[in-house]
């Protein structure tokens, strides 16, 4: 893989190990330098105006560096074809790798939401609201950047009678919900929340972060608890919300199908 000089100079002779996790179109590699681990992330400039943009995520990491525990941004670079960033590995583990009780998992997700909600949204560099996400989704659809739909293996509760991405997109365009904007992670999962030995929470994969409705993150947490803990744990989480909005949760889970 040919790299820009500034990126190659930092990596030196280190071996790049592929580190593909999740469905992001970005390429991720880990490497060691002076007994420390780093990550190189690269995205095509085709995604520059989307939440998959590595430059977008790098700016978000920089903005969040004194607000949340996030990976340290080392450098960024962009040429005509790709966007690059190098981050330093954190000394923590994803909660997916920990043996947690349902109650512990619930407590971590609640604390994660509290940390995110504590961030003042003044001067937040990015918008991730419905307008932005629908525009992004239409770009993916028009450019055939989404995976083929497996008609035998998809969530019928979310898809209903829809057979195409465009059909689902049309529904979401016509039924958009009102928004109460907060700072949102945008992609909370058990592989994007890490815990260190002091039980401090770290956030990773912040490409979708920005101003969005509060129920974006709530819907993801409810789904994580329902799938990784139990239906009862998810219900307990919802019970402690000031005001649950099942319509919003359903809307944002549907919107997630278009990314």
UniProtKB/Swiss-Prot annotation:
<dbReference type="InterPro" id="IPR051678">
    <property type="entry name" value="AGP_Transferase"/>
</dbReference>
<comment type="similarity">
    <text>Belongs to the aminoglycoside phosphotransferase family.</text>
</comment>
<protein>
    <recommendedName>
        <fullName>Aminoglycoside 3'-phosphotransferase</fullName>
        <ecNumber>2.7.1.95</ecNumber>
    </recommendedName>
</protein>
<feature type="active site" description="Proton acceptor">
    <location>
        <position position="187"/>
    </location>
</feature>
<keyword id="KW-0067">ATP-binding</keyword>
<keyword id="KW-0547">Nucleotide-binding</keyword>
<keyword id="KW-0046">Antibiotic resistance</keyword>
<keyword id="KW-0808">Transferase</keyword>
<dbReference type="Pfam" id="PF01636">
    <property type="entry name" value="APH"/>
</dbReference>
<dbReference type="GO" id="GO:0008910">
    <property type="term" value="F:kanamycin kinase activity"/>
</dbReference>
<dbReference type="InterPro" id="IPR011009">
    <property type="entry name" value="Kinase-like_dom_sf"/>
</dbReference>
<keyword id="KW-0418">Kinase</keyword>
<dbReference type="InterPro" id="IPR002575">
    <property type="entry name" value="Aminoglycoside_PTrfase"/>
</dbReference>
<dbReference type="InterPro" id="IPR024165">
    <property type="entry name" value="Kan/Strep_kinase"/>
</dbReference>
<dbReference type="GO" id="GO:0005524">
    <property type="term" value="F:ATP binding"/>
</dbReference>
<comment type="function">
    <text>Resistance to kanamycin and structurally-related aminoglycosides, including amikacin.</text>
</comment>
<dbReference type="GO" id="GO:0046677">
    <property type="term" value="P:response to antibiotic"/>
</dbReference>
